């Protein structure tokens, strides 16, 4: 596996989310570059929101940790935001 780039991180978030939800066709990831931090906005079906967040937010926290770790390799900051 090569060095991750923003397209791979977007695809990674999309893959993780689609693996968790009942409605994978409604998963969408938007990338919003900023000056210091790139935001990855994850949109899922309202009924799948709990599955992506997980008990006590553990699933969402794990996804954010993976994204931050990949960003560290690129010397960039990434933030995962889960929106309805």
Describe the residue ranges of each PLM region.
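RNA-contacting regions in translation and RNA-metabolism proteins
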Residues: 1-51, 66-84
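Glycine-centered tight-turn and secondary-structure capping sites
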Residues: 53-57
């Amino acid at each position: 596996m090569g060095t991750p780039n923003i397209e791979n991180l977007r695809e990674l978030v999309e893959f993780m989310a689609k693996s968790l939800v009942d409605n994978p066709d409604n998963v969408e990831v938007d990338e919003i570059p900023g000056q210091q931090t790139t935001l990855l906005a994850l949109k899922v079906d309202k009924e799948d929101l709990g599955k992506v967040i997980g008990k006590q937010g553990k699933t969402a926290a794990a996804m954010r940790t993976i994204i931050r770790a990949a960003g560290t390799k690129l010397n960039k900051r990434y933030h995962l935001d889960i929106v309805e």
